Amino acid sequence: MTKKNDPGISCSMEEFLGTDEVESVTSNTSWALKERLSFKPPLCDVFRQPFHLLEDTGEFKFHVHPEARKHLPDIIENVVQKIAGNENPEETAKQQYTKQRNIGIVFSGGPAPGGHNVIAGLYDAMIRANPDNRLFGFLMGPDGILENNYIEITADTVDSYRNLGGFGMIKTGRTKIDSPSKMKKAKTTCLTLELDALVIVGGDDSNTNAAFLAQELYQDGVQVIGVPKTIDGDIQVRDVNGNSLCAVSFGFHTAARAFAHNVNNLCSDCSSDVKYWHICKVMGRVASHLALEVGLQVHPNITLIGEELADFIDQERIEKAKKEGTTDYTAYGMTLRQVSRLICDGIVRRAAVGKNYGVIVIPEGLLEFINEIQVFIIKLNTIIADYNNTHDTDFHSQFPTLEDKLEYLRQMARMSRENRMFTVWNTRDDDLFNVLPDFFQEGLLTERDSHGNFQFSQMETDRVVMGLVEDYLKMLADRGVYKNGITVESYRQTMEEGGLDPDLYGPALFRDYKPDNGFLLVKESIVSVKTLKQNLVKEEVIDPDEDIPKPVETIYKQSVPKFKTQYHFYGYDGRGNDPTWFDCTYTYNLGNNVFSLIANGATGQMAAIRNLEKEFKDWEPIGLPIGSLMHLEERMGKLTLVMERALVDIQSPAFSVFAAKRDRWLAATPGEDCYRRPGPIRYAGESEDARPITLILNDLGSDVRPGDGS
């Protein structure tokens, strides 16, 4: 190349743009990508053996739902299976293990970091067993199965995606194979391709699909294996005795780390310019696992956990009801108003020590844990459905504006006062509803989906909560409760530079004036320049006809807080992130596990790794019976057999540690904040997290009895 910056040498721009060096610098393949593609995740010891067998174990038991037994008769007797290594099995077992197979794989639902390594692990394992094995990737999710749309996955394909995030290799989709016609199409595709096995990588719904497909294809000899995927972390499996068999789904650790890194950047920002509260909503509609992990990773000033709010009991209201000889069912579960008060308390306490800034983490599904919101949704669903069933026009056409709808609800509240039998919408409902911000009222009253259900995903959870917070903070400011703390040094310097005696004015200005206090709070009665002067006159530090001294007015204005917010949503960026070492390794071993299950004839099983909460050397690949994990749940207005999702256990060691430390992390004291820097995601190196903090803490506290140390 002729370098343009070499002395005495020049070249045209056209020549410069065509050089190899320019192409190298601007290539799609960065050095970081090259290193990722070449990273080789370690294998569990069992997978280092040339052959693998399955060992049925009666060690773990489940409560099997009668409906699961009814609808999944051919796979419901499955048990937990351990993968065992074998160097030289019997010839029959060896032939079974190494026979040529056609295997299909599909991604279902949203992306989760590590999916490509499931494919890589499966591909490597099956090629080791028999180089003639073939792997077909169905494109665009389950639609690829229904439409027989696939690619054959080769070594070059796999090598192009090792350790990378996203589901770009074969894409994904949310279609469910949940009807007889779809089942028939899926079966036709599997039989046309002469598949020996189908692997479904997905969340609770997708693994439910895997169970029903396993049942449907059982007589055709097509095995179906599920793989636990969801960044929400709500696929967790325990047996009836509480033994952890699958501590978390893949993708969770990477998403949490990605969110944590971004949230920590905001911690650095807010503590630098000290004027914003950053409101961070993180994915997790059904469970708050991501919010809890981010809280433990970063130590934000306030982190809300939906499951804890749902578990709240208002003892004052219970006692009041007891005295009245009644039961107050609304005393169970925190109300929106109480949630807003909780946040306001933290904001006010921080402002009092000069920290009118901070970071709040809110789980996406927070509103689903608020009892009053669920009650509102049930009642409004009933009101709207009843209206549509009894009138010639529908509710939303008859009442097009928010005010029209609110007036109709007011009429119903008046009816409840006149007729005690009318309980669908009473005065208390109306009063609580009118406290909500207009946009949230509008959201709760929007048109239902085709099944008559409320569309929760359309709600801006963070703005709903913070709208109430801002209203209450204004009220607290008007009452003189919400104030910025003033440092003694700043106060004395301002006064002395203005030629005033700080000790003369201090008792008139501040609540508990002591020259050795770290921070001073202006009296609650001083809420305006007018009340400031009244206090100064009352304390006889100025005469009624005197103006307020400029330094005193400056101090007052500094005490008046300005509540400024910035909103952030963390979801899609985390689920598309390149995976951590934990997820790279977890998923690569899951892929190997999938082949071991297939090679030994398993079907209706979910590949899993036991002991994820422990060090890598203790990981134990197993197969879990999906049918035994099913329960009935309301979906789309009817009870449906689905795989159960796990919520945050507020009795767990991880949550207990979080609860014990959150007041320290609020940092409502003079001095530095307690923010933790998790650092960027890596796939190797001593600085990389070995596993999620929630898993580490739960393992550390596994022998601690509830209540110990309290």
Residue ranges of model-derived segments:
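N-terminal glycine-rich phosphate/adenylate-binding segment common to multiple enzyme folds
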Residues: K3, S12, E21, T175-D220
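N-terminal phosphate-binding or glycine-rich loops at protein starts, especially the Walker A/P-loop
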Residues: T2-P41, A93-L146
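Phosphate-binding loop/pocket of nucleotide- and phosphate-handling active sites
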Residues: D545-E546, K550-V552, Y556-V560, L612-S710
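Accessory alpha-helical/coil subdomains and C-terminal extensions
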Residues: I200-G202, T208-F212, E216-L217, G221-I225, ...
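Short glycine-rich or small-residue beta-strand-to-loop segments that form or flank ligand, phosphate
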Residues: N102-A112, G168-G173, D196-G202, W277-V282, ...
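Short glycine/serine/threonine-rich phosphate/pyrophosphate-binding segments
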Residues: A112-L122, I145-L146, S179-K184, G203-F212, ...
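Glycine-rich oxoanion-binding loops at beta->alpha junctions
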Residues: Q49-Q96, I145-D196, N241-N243, V248-N264
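Helix-enriched interaction subdomains in cytosolic or periplasmic regions
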Residues: D20-K82, I318-G325
